[in-house]
Amino acid sequence: MDVKECIGKGLLQRVPPNRELSAKEWREAELDMAEAKALLKEKRLKRSTTTSYYAMFHAAKAVLFKLGFREKAHYAIAVVLEDLAKRGKLEMRFADDFRAAMHAREGADYHYSYSEETARSLVSIAGEFVTEMKKLYRE
């Protein structure tokens, strides 16, 4: 599926770019990133896993608002990230990392599948992802 198909299926909407909504998403991304690290230290692995994903989710949403998109499904964010990668604006690994984090979050929430290794890896990946989204946002 591509961006046009996501729009056609109602998974993504075109909206006017909105810096105010982007700023709110950045605040949430930063809060979630700090919380994911703290949860990992406390060995609260399920919550660290899910919160790392949400740090990525909010950072990506900040970029989407700048680009003039509002997501109606988490999957649509991955599609936009892949589109950005195909256009040379983002390394494909960040789109892949987002998808992997999305699956890890779903595993933790719905299948009670999580581990210290996954939580530790996601905290690291989320930190890199948020940093990369900030670079992309500034372009």
Regions found by a protein language model. Name each.
Residues M1-E139:
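Terminal alpha-helical segments
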